[in-house]
Amino acid sequence: MAIKVGINGFGRIGRSFFRASWGREEIEIVAINDLTDAKHLAHLLKYDSVHGIFKGSVEAKDDSIVVDGKEIKVFAQKDPSQIPWGDLGVDVVIEATGVFRDRENASKHLQGGAKKVIITAPAKNPDITVVLGVNEEKYNPKEHNIISNASCTTNCLAPCVKVLNEAFGVEKGYMVTVHAYTNDQRLLDLPHKDFRRARAAAINIVPTTTGAAKAIGEVIPELKGKLDGTARRVPVPDGSLIDLTVVVNKAPSSVEEVNEKFREAAQKYRESGKVYLKEILQYCEDPIVSTDIVGNPHSAIFDAPLTQVIDNLVHIAAWYDNEWGYSCRLRDLVIYLAERGL
């Protein structure tokens, strides 16, 4: 039986999750909550400037959208506790508004009748933060109801750090994410609490903050406090890159040794037999650029030619589609919860 899913917030991630999940026999999307009307939601689902036209049929009704003949209820509730998830038999809510990222607010979905909530961002005081391929085995269905899927950057970074830590032992490190602009920035100069994000996104390199590196400690506890990082938002709408430099305890003998560890890890994930692990890490030796990874479902695309080694100082780089790759992990996390009996 398919797991029933509701989506709260039908923005970039909400719609990408819908696309990634639609047609999968394990998942049935039954409802969407968003303050925008159904007509607009249907249009934005069908036509996407980055990911193209939706391959199925999409039409709007007064309080629903119809996709490939299946009607999906649309609500416009500001208070998550008022969304009738329970009446629809919803098992999991994808909390994708970017607003309800703390325990108090996310738990309102449980009041509405949902069994589990997955927050599509780093969260304040969730029951657990899960990064597939890194710490999913820590999930306990009986104890964990409010789950953070971390950020797109952490989902790229964590598998890479895991490989390095297991192979060489990470002493400390620093990450820079070269990140596509997002809706949290301004199209043209306009006030923002972050003065740099107030500047026009499509014509500037915008230095800003990221919690992705610090969040590693939540999924790899022995590295808590050992990593930090920063972000550079750049003028592309999708497709990002992490640049990671670490000091390791055991110096690798060569660049080739580092790359071989990633090649082996990518193969291990791919051949794991677990549907939710197949697309964690991809090994690439081609001289690619950001456009080449848009639409790539992997959490991290390791760029082997960019690896550098100086004694016990190791530098690696990995690409990620910050929308599609992350949304595919959301989909796979739902599947994983179902496999664990919710």
From Swiss-Prot:
<dbReference type="GO" id="GO:0006096">
    <property type="term" value="P:glycolytic process"/>
</dbReference>
<keyword id="KW-0963">Cytoplasm</keyword>
<dbReference type="InterPro" id="IPR020831">
    <property type="entry name" value="GlycerAld/Erythrose_P_DH"/>
</dbReference>
<protein>
    <recommendedName>
        <fullName>Glyceraldehyde-3-phosphate dehydrogenase</fullName>
        <ecNumber>1.2.1.12</ecNumber>
    </recommendedName>
</protein>
<feature type="binding site">
    <location>
        <position position="182"/>
    </location>
    <ligand>
        <name>D-glyceraldehyde 3-phosphate</name>
    </ligand>
</feature>
<feature type="binding site">
    <location>
        <position position="34"/>
    </location>
    <ligand>
        <name>NAD(+)</name>
    </ligand>
</feature>
<dbReference type="Pfam" id="PF02800">
    <property type="entry name" value="Gp_dh_C"/>
</dbReference>
<comment type="similarity">
    <text>Belongs to the glyceraldehyde-3-phosphate dehydrogenase family.</text>
</comment>
<feature type="binding site">
    <location>
        <position position="78"/>
    </location>
    <ligand>
        <name>NAD(+)</name>
    </ligand>
</feature>
<dbReference type="GO" id="GO:0005737">
    <property type="term" value="C:cytoplasm"/>
</dbReference>
<dbReference type="Pfam" id="PF00044">
    <property type="entry name" value="Gp_dh_N"/>
</dbReference>
<feature type="binding site">
    <location>
        <position position="120"/>
    </location>
    <ligand>
        <name>NAD(+)</name>
    </ligand>
</feature>
<feature type="binding site">
    <location>
        <position position="322"/>
    </location>
    <ligand>
        <name>NAD(+)</name>
    </ligand>
</feature>
<comment type="pathway">
    <text>Carbohydrate degradation; glycolysis; pyruvate from D-glyceraldehyde 3-phosphate: step 1/5.</text>
</comment>
<dbReference type="GO" id="GO:0051287">
    <property type="term" value="F:NAD binding"/>
</dbReference>
<feature type="site" description="Activates thiol group during catalysis">
    <location>
        <position position="179"/>
    </location>
</feature>
<keyword id="KW-0547">Nucleotide-binding</keyword>
<feature type="active site" description="Nucleophile">
    <location>
        <position position="152"/>
    </location>
</feature>
<keyword id="KW-0520">NAD</keyword>
<keyword id="KW-0324">Glycolysis</keyword>
<dbReference type="GO" id="GO:0050661">
    <property type="term" value="F:NADP binding"/>
</dbReference>
<comment type="subunit">
    <text>Homotetramer.</text>
</comment>
<dbReference type="InterPro" id="IPR020829">
    <property type="entry name" value="GlycerAld_3-P_DH_cat"/>
</dbReference>
<comment type="function">
    <text>Catalyzes the oxidative phosphorylation of glyceraldehyde 3-phosphate (G3P) to 1,3-bisphosphoglycerate (BPG) using the cofactor NAD. The first reaction step involves the formation of a hemiacetal intermediate between G3P and a cysteine residue, and this hemiacetal intermediate is then oxidized to a thioester, with concomitant reduction of NAD to NADH. The reduced NADH is then exchanged with the second NAD, and the thioester is attacked by a nucleophilic inorganic phosphate to produce BPG.</text>
</comment>
<feature type="binding site">
    <location>
        <begin position="210"/>
        <end position="211"/>
    </location>
    <ligand>
        <name>D-glyceraldehyde 3-phosphate</name>
    </ligand>
</feature>
<dbReference type="InterPro" id="IPR020828">
    <property type="entry name" value="GlycerAld_3-P_DH_NAD(P)-bd"/>
</dbReference>
<feature type="binding site">
    <location>
        <position position="233"/>
    </location>
    <ligand>
        <name>D-glyceraldehyde 3-phosphate</name>
    </ligand>
</feature>
<feature type="binding site">
    <location>
        <position position="197"/>
    </location>
    <ligand>
        <name>D-glyceraldehyde 3-phosphate</name>
    </ligand>
</feature>
<dbReference type="InterPro" id="IPR020830">
    <property type="entry name" value="GlycerAld_3-P_DH_AS"/>
</dbReference>
<dbReference type="GO" id="GO:0006006">
    <property type="term" value="P:glucose metabolic process"/>
</dbReference>
<feature type="binding site">
    <location>
        <begin position="151"/>
        <end position="153"/>
    </location>
    <ligand>
        <name>D-glyceraldehyde 3-phosphate</name>
    </ligand>
</feature>
<keyword id="KW-0560">Oxidoreductase</keyword>
<feature type="binding site">
    <location>
        <position position="183"/>
    </location>
    <ligand>
        <name>NAD(+)</name>
    </ligand>
</feature>
<dbReference type="InterPro" id="IPR006424">
    <property type="entry name" value="Glyceraldehyde-3-P_DH_1"/>
</dbReference>
<feature type="binding site">
    <location>
        <begin position="12"/>
        <end position="13"/>
    </location>
    <ligand>
        <name>NAD(+)</name>
    </ligand>
</feature>
<dbReference type="InterPro" id="IPR036291">
    <property type="entry name" value="NAD(P)-bd_dom_sf"/>
</dbReference>
<dbReference type="GO" id="GO:0004365">
    <property type="term" value="F:glyceraldehyde-3-phosphate dehydrogenase (NAD+) (phosphorylating) activity"/>
</dbReference>
